Amino acid sequence: MALDELKAAVPDYAKDLRLNLGSVIGNSDLPQQQLWGTVLACAIASRSPRVLRELEPQAKANLSPEAYTAAKSAAAIMAMNNVFYRTRHLLSDPEYGTLRAGLRMNVIGNPGVEKVDFELWSLAVSAVNGCGQCLDSHEQVLRKAGVDRDTIQEAFKIAAVIQAVGTTLDAEAVLAE
């Protein structure tokens, strides 16, 4: 199992990450589609080749072709939106908030899977990318759809752990050169 290989690669100084990786993925209460879509989207967002290589096959095996594509779409569209909306939010000139975005985001309206799942994946990727405005927006949509806080927190816990593991393993790879 790739998850076990990934856990084994985490150095002892980051043992907490190893344990967290096992618990947030291996013991998650999320339905399989929500879990593995979150894992795949966050692995892509982490920008860690090792993490993506290790987790993608298991995600693909646990997702329908439509969900697999939608999770990748969530990572792709949020890569754009998180930069755009975070920048708009951080600029001190509020006029930028009144301007038309002018960016295509059709996949958000028609993701090919349940809207709640796509929103959850988008929230998790927004956590990795640090866009507060996007986090608030996706959290509100999820809450209005009846998703509880525990489920939402589960998604951003997965995001946090995958990001941390990616950072750690990428650093170790550079230090080993």
UniProtKB/Swiss-Prot annotation:
Gene Ontology molecular functions: alkyl hydroperoxide reductase activity; disulfide oxidoreductase activity; hydroperoxide reductase activity; peroxiredoxin activity
Assembly notes: Homotrimer.
Signal peptide: none
Keywords assigned by UniProt, alphabetized: Antioxidant, Disulfide bond, Oxidoreductase, Peroxidase, Redox-active center
Reactions accelerated catalytically: N(6)-[(R)-dihydrolipoyl]-L-lysyl-[lipoyl-carrier protein] + a hydroperoxide = N(6)-[(R)-lipoyl]-L-lysyl-[lipoyl-carrier protein] + an alcohol + H2O
One of the GO biological process terms: cell redox homeostasis
Physiological role: Antioxidant protein with alkyl hydroperoxidase activity. Required for the reduction of the AhpC active site cysteine residues and for the regeneration of the AhpC enzyme activity.
Gene3D superfamilies associated with the record: AhpD-like (1.20.1290.10)
Entry similarity comment: Belongs to the AhpD family.
Protein name: Alkyl hydroperoxide reductase AhpD
Active site: C131, C134
Enzyme kind, highest EC tier: oxidoreductase
Cystine crosslinks: C131-C134
Catalytic activity, EC: 1.11.1.28
One Pfam family per UniProt: CMD
